[in-house]
């Protein structure tokens, strides 16, 4: 059984036991959360798709940790003009583990 959920403006295909890094969620480490924006659930041959969301479907997860991704470097340069600009960025994330899928 798997589901497609939407959180943080992105869509993820999840199964029970998966760990994934999503955009920062306002939850404490170790707490249980309910993700109710479920787009699709597939259970063997039966597939339920929402238009756009399924009403009664929920995915439960546990917050494992909060952290920051690796730094990416943004570098802009104009040739022959002595113009160089460098900037770095680290995105915050929340790591969750999927504990259940209910339709």
From Swiss-Prot:
GO terms for cellular component: cytoplasm; ribonucleoprotein complex; ribosome. Part of the 50S ribosomal subunit. Contacts protein L20. This is Large ribosomal subunit protein bL21. The keyword Manganese does not apply. Belongs to the bacterial ribosomal protein bL21 family. The keyword RNA-binding applies. One of its GO terms (biological process) is translation. One of its GO terms (molecular function) is structural constituent of ribosome. It comes from Nitrosomonas europaea (strain ATCC 19718 / CIP 103999 / KCTC 2705 / NBRC 14298). Keywords: Ribonucleoprotein, Ribosomal protein, RNA-binding, rRNA-binding.
């Amino acid at each position: 059984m798997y589901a497609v959920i939407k959180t943080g403006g992105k869509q993820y295909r999840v199964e029970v036991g998966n760990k994934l890094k999503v955009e920062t969620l306002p939850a404490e480490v170790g707490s249980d959360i309910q993700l109710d924006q479920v787009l699709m659930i597939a259970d063997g041959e039966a597939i339920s798709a929402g238009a756009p969301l399924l009403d009664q479907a929920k995915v439960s997860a546990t917050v494992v940790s909060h952290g920051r991704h690796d730094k990416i470097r943004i570098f802009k340069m104009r040739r022959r003009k002595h113009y160089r600009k460098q900037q770095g960025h680290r995105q915050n994330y929340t790591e969750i583990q999927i504990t259940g899928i209910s339709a």
